[in-house]
Amino acid sequence: MSAKTGTSKTLYEKVYDAHVAVAAEGENPILYIDRHLVHEVTSPQAFDGLREKGRKVRQIGKTFATMDHNVSTQTKDINASGEMARIQMETLAKNCKEFGVTLYDLNHKYQGIVHVIGPELGITLPGMTIVCGDSHTATHGAFGSLAFGIGTSEVEHVLATQTLKQSLAKTMKIEVVGKVAEGITAKDIVLAIIGKTTAAGGTGYVVEFCGEAITDLTMEGRMTVCNMAIELGAKAGLIAPDQTTYDYIKDRKFSPTGANFDAAVEYWSTLKTDDGATFDAVVTLDAKNIKPQVTWGTNPGQVIAIDELIPGPDNFSEQVDKTSAEKALAYMGLEAGKKLSDFDIDKVFIGSCTNSRIEDMRAAAAIAKGRKVAANVQALVVPGSEQVKAQAEKEGLDKIFIEAGFEWRLPGCSMCLAMNNDRLGPKERCASTSNRNFEGRQGRDGRTHLVSPAMAAAAACAGHFVDIRDLDNATA
């Protein structure tokens, strides 16, 4: 079905309607896809499918590939992450060469995590439809684009046709009213949102994030929020573009220039929800109540403020939540009624498509400066791209991290997921700036706590979680 034809539309409905290529009676509409981002893990079978059917990539100018999931963060050696990783990366290189697709490979100055390089290169622009064979494609929605993850068969379909069948989703508005307190980050905001909606609260919806606390965010902060839209079950998350967006986009490699940029801004400024447009669901949070957040369980909705006690089954009314809490506490090795700061951590991971941009590096370095990583902790800082790495090194952030005892690594997805050499051992506890704390996500039987970069850096130095609002006391 197509979006409503009335005068008042949501941002999502405007972008969706603008991309309907074919709307046959009784069928899901076919959407045109503006950008297709490709990486080494979900693309091999898709290219094989093209080859078997004698097809070409329809729009090589709108298709961009990189290596990120499997890459080693310690060396540029393609063999370093094992045989499967090597095969996937070599296959991507072969496929991109054969089909004429732009590839930012291991040794390219633009290599990095796909959801970091898209925005920083100006590949991502407002009002676009953007897909990738990766669940955190929602990141690009920070620009007011409709961005979502797709499966491998859909990757093949987009490569071949530059289109995708897509039904219209339900709409949800999540408004964060007012201003956050000092030191509260985009990561804290989105974790607080998921804590309220639960990890399934957005299922079947496309979410628009709005409110003063959202528009106050930088583009990098907005990307963190939209990145985790999938973690409340949503198909995608969008934020309306504004002057902050246009200033970020200007002068990037693939951004429009001159009169074309001015014309683009004129169009982009129409990409906002109309007065009178209705949403299927509305969620409201008061920004001033948001504190530094830490997950305690095995989904991102199992989250508390750092100064709260770990909940137990008795804190929940629904039996399914009681059972889930009991199981999560057992897996995480936690005890209800205690504080998260009572438990030592083993590893810290600052990186991922959620929090590996230059502002994240700066926030972590500000905490690390003049401090030392605790003796019981291994702490990794993994920039999201070669561009982020170069900028951080230009600012001397790498030296701050190394001096404090952090490991300064090469760009890649790293310890977000156990697909390379960066992973947790059984029962190791990790403060992570990534987006998923599922069982085994960072390594078999590993225990993941999701936090902001500042909270992760503080935990690394203290050896356990601390409230960054009390930081002077925390490192004494």
UniProtKB/Swiss-Prot annotation:
A Pfam family the protein falls into: Aconitase
Keywords noted in UniProt: 4Fe-4S, Amino-acid biosynthesis, Branched-chain amino acid biosynthesis, Iron, Iron-sulfur, Leucine biosynthesis, Lyase, Metal-binding
Alphabetical list of HAMAP family matching this protein: LeuC_type1
Domain of life, source organism: Bacteria
GO molecular function annotations of the record: 3-isopropylmalate dehydratase activity; 4 iron, 4 sulfur cluster binding; metal ion binding
Protein EC: 4.2.1.33
Protein name (record): 3-isopropylmalate dehydratase large subunit
Pathway(s) this gene product operates in, as recorded in its UniProt entry: Amino-acid biosynthesis; L-leucine biosynthesis; L-leucine from 3-methyl-2-oxobutanoate: step 2/4
Top enzyme category: lyase
Catalytic activity, as annotated: (2R,3S)-3-isopropylmalate = (2S)-2-isopropylmalate
Origin species: Photobacterium profundum (strain SS9)
Cofactor(s) for this UniProt protein: [4Fe-4S] cluster
Binding-site list for [4Fe-4S] cluster: 353, 413, 416
Keyword 4Fe-4S in annotation: yes
Cofactor note text: Binds 1 [4Fe-4S] cluster per subunit.
Family: Belongs to the aconitase/IPM isomerase family. LeuC type 1 subfamily.
GO-annotated biological processes: L-leucine biosynthetic process
Record InterPro entries: 3-IsopropMal_deHydase_lsu, Acnase/IPM_dHydase_lsu_aba_1/3, Acoase/IPM_deHydtase_lsu_aba, Aconitase_4Fe-4S_BS, Aconitase_4Fe-4S_dom, IPM_dehydratase_rel_enz, IPMI_cat
Assembly notes: Heterodimer of LeuC and LeuD.
Role this protein plays: Catalyzes the isomerization between 2-isopropylmalate and 3-isopropylmalate, via the formation of 2-isopropylmaleate.
